């Protein structure tokens, strides 16, 4: 579970957000949604503990995993070694990863369908492949709460769909609690049980996804008309949010 009460963040003289409060139950997925520059990443990092709040409190129950928006590696590590880094909390500061840690890392790669990446260099991977590796590293930590910052940022449609389907499957199988930041309403619609709309410093709306992701709310959030369209594909009907560029 995640509990945030009256959270505020200030950078120098600029207030980024304030009076943010919500609770996310165990096993639920929530999205922090809004245009660029509304403080989504800052809020997520504050909840994770990477940035200090100016006021308020955060409680996270369970071991956490975190996938950043940008994952640069100073050295050209092999994929398996990067995933093993996710075992750091279990290994501790004064010993090296053991056979069991490598076994868990390999099993995680296999589960995500990227076991063939194990001996490849991270720097030689595509953007989508790198994101899969970082998700594997987080999952190898055996986390109960997973935080993701723009998990499909800068990826093409194929890799966006790949990552979203993977996350949906893993969440269902493991019962993870997930909080992710995104600027794409369709991704929140696909994954989230609950959504926070980041309108401004003082205005955030929180509630069930079906109540937050309405045409009226999204037009107010983005300043662009949005329509919800029913689409049938392979015998299934899904509602899809579509911006209207007119």
Each predicted region: which residue ranges?
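ABC ATPase nucleotide-binding domains
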Residues: 222-246
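Conserved ABC ATPase "signature" region
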Residues: 84, 99-117, 142
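Helix-to-loop junction immediately C-terminal to a conserved catalytic motif
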Residues: 48
């Amino acid at each position: 579970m995640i509990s945030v009460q009256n959270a505020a963040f200030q950078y120098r003289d600029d207030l980024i957000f304030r009076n943010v409060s919500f609770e996310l139950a165990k096993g639920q997925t929530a999205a922090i949604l809004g245009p660029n520059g509304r403080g989504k990443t800052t809020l997520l990092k504050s909840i994770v503990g990477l940035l200090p709040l100016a006021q308020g409190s955060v409680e996270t129950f369970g071991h956490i995993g975190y996938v950043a928006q940008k994952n640069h590696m100073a050295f050209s590590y092999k994929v398996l070694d990067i995933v093993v880094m996710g075992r750091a909390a279990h290994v501790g500061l004064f010993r090296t990863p053991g056979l069991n840690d490598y076994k868990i890392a390999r099993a995680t790669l296999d589960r995500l369908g990227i076991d063939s990446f194990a001996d490849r260099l991270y720097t030689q991977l595509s953007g989508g492949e790198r994101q899969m590796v970082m998700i594997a590293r987080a999952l190898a930590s055996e986390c109960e709460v997973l935080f993701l910052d723009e998990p499909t940022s800068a990826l093409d449609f194929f890799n966006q769909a790949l990552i979203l389907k993977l996350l949906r499957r893993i969440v269902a199988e493991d019962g993870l609690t997930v909080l992710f930041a995104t600027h794409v309403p369709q991704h929140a619609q696909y994954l989230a049980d609950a959504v926070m709309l980041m309108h401004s410093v003082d205005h955030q709306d929180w509630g069930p996804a079906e109540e937050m992701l309405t045409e009226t709310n999204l037009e107010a959030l983005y300043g662009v008309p949005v329509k919800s369209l029913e689409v049938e594909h392979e015998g299934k009907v899904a509602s899809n949010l579509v911006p209207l560029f007119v």
